[in-house]
């Protein structure tokens, strides 16, 4: 299609929608004209462009943010002929393919209680009451603040011409030098930031407190308060007069207004704080008609002179930020950091409890809503997007409600349905809650409660996979898991009818004659799978057909018989026909196969004392899929055909039911240990996978590869074995090189003697011919002709590599993750039976035992409430030695890996590495304050304070106190994401090499759909922006790549945290992109943030993590790019110091850096310092590479060349001095100029030419080489 044709089609598919505004809502017109983002005409109309398939709801959504209409909440859109339904599309309304214009108008509706509350809530959001750190569960945990928004970035530079690289030879030791086109101001700013980074290492001043300090309150309220009045509810007498609610408003200036809400709007009444009079207040200059405002904003602006200016100031403030830095999340929660900058200000605000719109709506039935949305037809893309958007919203709303309900249970505020039972269940707002435990003995012999905990995770994991399958006849339940204080609650929507009260029968006992009331059996019961009541496995052909076609097929399950009944999933799962006639499947934990080899080795055949805590050791779905794909690929079968023919299926009941086996399950179990685990180790060692920043990063990689966390110990052992093997190979290679060096030295001595002999013999021949008066033949005057076979040419053999920078941090991070997960289980053990108020005391006590023993050797549990005596609880008997032994025991049982007895002590100078890992795993938030792990630290802190403060300071009894920390819920949910978006993205990926523009369009559509479905604040959106930045970078569109990556960072900071691996990974990408975009200052700012975050935990020193090394390497390249050699030398020296601290000064990395520093000094004519550094390299290169290696030979040439050059300079200096003592002034001047000439010539040379000069031994030879190189270029 031609470009014109495309444009025409686009024009036809787009419709101009004009919305006429009612005259009564026009307010603060001057403000509108300044701020209006859309075209507001004098006729009070708004105009937009929409695709034809757009639904009316989308127009309503746009109007809810347009400046002229955003304060309107209760209206309908209409044409001349009809009031529009939100589900209608523009195409259905116009009903004319040729028409591309639609005129609409707004019809205001009378208010009722629900709409008044919605209006007030909306207004509060727009005038600053919706703080950027609040989400649906802010009452239980504190959300992350922002740091990224405060980085003082320069604007993204537009694309410039390609940078020409300075010519260079193949010497790998020479720094790469790309000259960056930047201003002197940026060079200075860059240098300042780099020195700041250097100082943080030199003086060890990377401070945890400042590194984790964040800003909050980007959004600030424009009123002091906006609440329901204490005079509510409306008295009966006034209710019949139309009064709906009473409001109380206090402005920032202290003005107080009491407001009456009526169907037509709002007006100021005559009430005061102690007097009730809801009648309209007379205000001078305002007529009665003007006193009632349909819009509450207009009413406040009318009566408060400064309110409007406060709103303008807020809007101006927010305009300086990206919206993603302050908007509220729609389908996810904000990150809950382990270290909170400060306690949030708890300003008096009744509305937090008053204005909950749910109180004014009918009780929700999440299951009915969810299933109805799933059944919506989606014939068009727009309808698919709408369906996914609704599914995502309701999933998150369910999770929010579930968390609130679960926390009520944890705090003892919800009554159980069966208060006398140990297995208590709860029901509120059509959400069913139950404690996760083995109450009915289902896991007897399999691990009991531990197995039940594992099964709940596996059940949820299966549901997370089902959400992406478009199943029509099989239904599943919304599910959320909430962990808090050692207990776990499973929240689900109940199967319709399953919990319904069917009434009761009165029966007479045959023996006693007593009458008893017995509940009638529910008509809704298990019809397929395990019926727990009868203990039988039931068959149902219709149910089985649906399950096998829509569920089992995609999960590679094999249909099989159990007790004569044919089923297509695990016999422990259940199929229930709900009262809504839908087929529900529940209890899906055992969908995936047992890790049979692990179970047999560590549970079935293990001693009881060494047995793994449970047998619910299933393989992950990622592993099954990885194994299945490997089988399909090996067989050369087409994917769809393999699905249709049910290739490589497995029986989920194998090794779960006695006598049932499956060779494919055995193969999967072997595949995990023998193929996947070693390949992951190899990927880490070779750098194919990034070194993990922390345990979460590591586990994310393991899960992607289908590896369970129970293999963390195995991973650490394999990594240690790999490292040890490399070290052994390295040592063996060094011995071989040592022998080879001796051999070479012997050959060299012999060869030199041979040449010497040849020279002597030839000279004797020449002398004889001369004496005889004969002509000397040409062959005796030419260079000696040597036998090429006798010459040993320099080698370029690769060194024996030891991947210390990859494997050592992998081992350390794995051990820390084992420790953190071990502590999670130990804390769960001691907290599960505690009242909530005693939990902080237990946690503080355990942390003091582990980390505060140097401050207080014998800490005591802190009392929290007189009703709860902490000394009576089990945890109070703990000792440090006992706790360390328990850690070793639990780590050995759960991870098959025993941590060293001094493991915690290894981090005594960097305890927050371990504290952070415990906090993130167990749901603990600490205040960001000074903590003292020794008495000396407290004394130093005391001395640093002002004298007035110093005298009032009282030393804390322990390192940690109850007031320092908070327990927060840990949540696992479905997290509904867009399948359509993923499909668009996959299409774009396939097209990228064929049609770049089409691919980028598909990527843009995919992200737009993701944002529509999940909202802009979501991990999936951030990940897509990060990937898109990489795509644009590879296509040379660097400015766009930088913009996308910045957006990814801003999102990740809010939903994952400032120190999360996702954030650090995004920052690393951003730093490189800023460098590629010739913005060294911006790049340095990002590297500073990375280094500051990581070094505040001392991970370079304690974990051997290469992130700081990588940062210095990139900063060095940038400093060369801005032609600041001295700064480059400083960076190289710091880089070298880090390498020495980690690996010593006898490594190839050290020698390479010394050589690089020497080159840099030589380039600025500082030959003395150049010689000092370069002279250290031959010995190391000789030892590591061999005497006859190219690099070793080159380093010797450097040393000899520099030595000769320095001697030559000294001789010339001496000659100049001698001449100066006997010559006149003019002669003296000429001599000095001659003496300085070589140095001046060298100053003009690049590092590359300098090497040629030193190797050649004369400036003439250097010039010839340089000319030759330029000619080749």
Curated annotation (Swiss-Prot):
One cellular component term from this protein's GO annotations in UniProt:
cytoplasm
Q: Where is the region Disordered?
A: 1217-1242, 1254-1273
Q: Which UniProt keywords apply?
A: Cytoplasm, Repeat, TPR repeat
Q: Where is the composition biased (Basic residues)?
A: 1262-1273
Among Pfam families, the record links this protein to:
CLU, CLU_N, eIF3_p135, TPR_10
What InterPro entries does the record point to? CLU-central, CLU_dom, CLU_N, CLU_prot, GSKIP_dom_sf, TPR-like_helical_dom_sf
HAMAP family per record = CLU
Q: Which PANTHER family match?
A: CLUSTERED MITOCHONDRIA PROTEIN HOMOLOG, EUKARYOTIC TRANSLATION INITIATION FACTOR 3 SUBUNIT EIF-3
Protein family membership: Belongs to the CLU family.
Put simply, this protein is called Clustered mitochondria protein homolog
Organism field: Vanderwaltozyma polyspora (strain ATCC 22028 / DSM 70294 / BCRC 21397 / CBS 2163 / NBRC 10782 / NRRL Y-8283 / UCD 57-17) (Kluyveromyces polysporus)
């Amino acid at each position: 299609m031609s470009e014109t044709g495309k444009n025409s089609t686009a024009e036809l598919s787009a419709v101009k929608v004009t919305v006429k505004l009612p005259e009564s809502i026009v307010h603060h017109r001057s403000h509108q004209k300044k701020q209006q983002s859309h075209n507001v005409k004098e006729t009070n109309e708004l105009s937009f462009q929409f695709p034809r398939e757009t639904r009316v709801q989308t127009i309503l959504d746009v109007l809810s943010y347009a400046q002229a209409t955003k304060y309107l909440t209760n209206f309908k859109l209409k044409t001349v002929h009809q009031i529009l339904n939100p589900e209608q599309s523009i195409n259905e309304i116009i009903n004319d393919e040729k028409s591309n214009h639609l005129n609409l108008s707004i019809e205001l509706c009378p208010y009722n209680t629900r709409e008044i509350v919605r209006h007030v809530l909306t207004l509060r959001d727009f005038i600053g009451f919706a703080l950027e750190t609040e989400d649906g569960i802010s009452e239980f945990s504190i959300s992350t603040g922002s740091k990224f928004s405060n980085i003082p970035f320069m604007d993204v530079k537009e694309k410039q011409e390609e940078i020409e690289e300075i010519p260079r030879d193949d010497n790998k030791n020479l720094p790469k030098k790309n000259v960056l086109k930047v201003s002197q101001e940026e060079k200075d700013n860059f240098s300042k930031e780099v020195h700041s980074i250097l100082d943080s290492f030199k003086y060890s001043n990377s401070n945890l407190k400042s590194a984790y300090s964040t800003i909050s309150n980007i959004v600030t309220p424009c009123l002091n308060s906006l609440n329901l009045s204490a005079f509510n509810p409306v008295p009966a007498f006034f209710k019949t007069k139309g009064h709906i609610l009473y409001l109380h408003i206090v402005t920032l200036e202290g003005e107080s207004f009491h407001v009456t809400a009526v169907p037509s709007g709002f007006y100021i009444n005559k009430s005061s704080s102690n007097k009730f009079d809801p009648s309209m207040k007379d205000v001078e200059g305002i007529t009665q008609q003007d006193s009632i405002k349909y819009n509450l904003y207009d009413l406040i602006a009318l009566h408060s002179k400064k309110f409007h200016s406060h709103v303008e100031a807020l809007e101006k403030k927010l305009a300086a930020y990206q919206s993603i830095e302050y908007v509220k999340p729609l389908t996810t929660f904000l990150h809950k950091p382990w270290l909170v900058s400060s306690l949030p200000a708890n300003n008096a605000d009744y509305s937090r409890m008053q204005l909950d719109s749910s109180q004014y709506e009918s009780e929700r039935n999440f299951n009915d809503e969810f299933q109805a949305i799933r059944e919506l037809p989606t014939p068009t893309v727009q309808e698919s997007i709408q369906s996914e958007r609704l599914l995502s919203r309701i999933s998150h709303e369910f999770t929010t409600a579930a968390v609130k309900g679960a926390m009520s249970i944890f705090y003892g505020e919800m009554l159980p349905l069966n208060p006398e039972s140990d297995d208590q269940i709860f029901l509120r707002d059509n959400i069913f809650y139950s404690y996760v435990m083995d109450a009915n003995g289902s896991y007897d012999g399999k691990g009991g409660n531990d197995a039940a905990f594992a099964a709940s995770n596996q059940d949820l994991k299966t549901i997370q996979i089902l959400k992406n399958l478009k199943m029509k006849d099989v239904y599943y339940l919304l599910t959320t898991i909430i962990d808090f204080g050692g207990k776990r609650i499973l929240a689900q929507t109940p199967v319709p009818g399953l919990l319904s009260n069917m009434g009761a029968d009165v029966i007479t006992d045959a023996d006693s004659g007593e009458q008893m009331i017995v509940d009638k059996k529910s008509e809704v019961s298990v019809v397929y799978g395990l019926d727990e009541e009868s203990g039988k496995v039931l068959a149902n052909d219709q149910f089985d057909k649906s399950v096998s076609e829509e569920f089992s097929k995609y999960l590679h399950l094999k249909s099989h018989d159990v007790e004569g009944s044919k089923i297509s999933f695990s016999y422990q799962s259940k199929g229930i026909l709900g009262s809504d006639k839908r087929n529900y499947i529940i209890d899906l934990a055992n969908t995936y196969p047992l890790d049979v080899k692990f179970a047999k080795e560590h549970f079935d055949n293990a001693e009881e004392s060494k047995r793994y805590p449970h047998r619910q050791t299933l393989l992950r779905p990622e592993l099954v899929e990885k194994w299945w794909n490997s089988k399909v690929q090996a067989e050369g079968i087409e994917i769809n055909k393999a699905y249709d023919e049910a290739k490589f299926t497995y029986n989920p009941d194998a090794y779960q039911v006695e006598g049932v086996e499956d060779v494919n399950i055995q193969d999967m179990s072997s595949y995990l240990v023998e193929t996947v685990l070693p390949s992951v180790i190899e990927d880490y060692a070779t750098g194919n996978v990034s070194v993990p920043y922390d345990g979460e990063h590591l586990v994310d990689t393991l899960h992607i590869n289908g590896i369970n966390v129970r293999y963390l110990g195995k991973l650490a052992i394999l990594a240690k074995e790999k490292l040890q093997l490399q070290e052994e190979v390295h040592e063996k290679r060094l011995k071989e090189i040592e022998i080879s060096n001796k051999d070479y030295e012997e050959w060299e001595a012999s060869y030199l003697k041979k040449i010497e002999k040849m020279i002597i013999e030839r000279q004797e021949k020449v002398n004889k011919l001369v004496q005889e008066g004969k002509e000397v033949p040409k062959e005796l005057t030419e260079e000696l002709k040597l036998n090429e076979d006798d010459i040993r040419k320099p080698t370029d053999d690769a060194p024996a590599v030891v991947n210390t920078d990859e494997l050592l941090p992998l081992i350390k991070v794995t051990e820390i993750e084992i420790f953190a997960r071990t502590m999670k289980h130990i804390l769960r053990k001691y907290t599960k039976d505690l009242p909530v108020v005693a939990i902080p005391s237990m946690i503080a006590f355990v942390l003091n035992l582990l980390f505060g023993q140097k401050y207080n050797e014998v800490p005591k549990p802190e009392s929290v409430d007189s009703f709860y005596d902490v000394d009576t609880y089990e945890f109070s008997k703990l000792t440090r030695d006992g706790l360390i032994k328990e850690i070793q025991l639990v780590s050995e049982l759960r991870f098959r890996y025993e941590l060293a007895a001094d493991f915690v002590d290894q981090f005594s100078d960097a305890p927050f590495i371990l504290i952070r890992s415990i906090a993130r795993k167990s749901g603990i938030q600490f205040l960001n304050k000074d903590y003292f792990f020794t008495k000396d630290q407290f004394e130093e802190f005391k001395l640093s304070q002002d004298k007035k403060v110093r005298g009032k300071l009282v030393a804390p009894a322990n390192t940690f106190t109850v007031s320092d920390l908070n327990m927060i819920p840990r949540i696992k949910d479905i997290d509904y994401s867009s399948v359509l978006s993923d499909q668009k993205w996959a299409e774009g990926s396939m097209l990228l090499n064929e049609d770049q523009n089409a691919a980028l369009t598909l990527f843009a559509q995919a992200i737009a759909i993701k944002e529509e479905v999940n909202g802009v604040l979501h991990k999936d959106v951030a990940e897509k922006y990060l990937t898109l930045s990489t795509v644009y970078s590879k296509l040379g569109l660097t400015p766009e790549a930088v913009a996308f990556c910045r957006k990814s960072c801003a999102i990740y900071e809010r939903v994952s945290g400032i120190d999360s691996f996702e954030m650090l990974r995004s920052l690393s990408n951003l730093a490189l992109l800023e460098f590629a975009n010739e913005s060294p200052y911006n790049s340095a700012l990002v590297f500073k943030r990375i280094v500051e975050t990581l070094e505040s935990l001392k991970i370079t020193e304690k974990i051997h993590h290469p992130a700081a090394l990588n940062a210095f390497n990139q900063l060095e390249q940038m400093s060369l790019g801005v032609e600041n050699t001295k700064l480059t030398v400083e960076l190289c020296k710091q880089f070298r110091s880090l390498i020495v601290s980690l690996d010593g000064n006898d490594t190839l990395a050290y020698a390479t850096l010394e050589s690089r520093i020497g080159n840099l000094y030589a380039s600025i004519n500082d030959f003395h310092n150049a010689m000092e550094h370069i002279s250290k390299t031959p010995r190391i290169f000789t030892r590591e590479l061999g005497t006859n290696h190219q690099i070793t030979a080159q380093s010797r040439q450097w040393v000899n060349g520099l030595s000769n050059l320095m001697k030559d300079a000294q001789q010339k200096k001496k000659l100049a001095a001698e001449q100066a003592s006997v010559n006149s002034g003019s002669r003296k001047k000429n001599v000095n100029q001659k003496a300085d000439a070589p140095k001046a010539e060298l100053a003009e040379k690049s590092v590359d030419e300098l090497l040629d000069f030193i190797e050649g031994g004369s400036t003439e030879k250097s010039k010839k080489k340089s000319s030759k190189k330029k000619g080749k270029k």
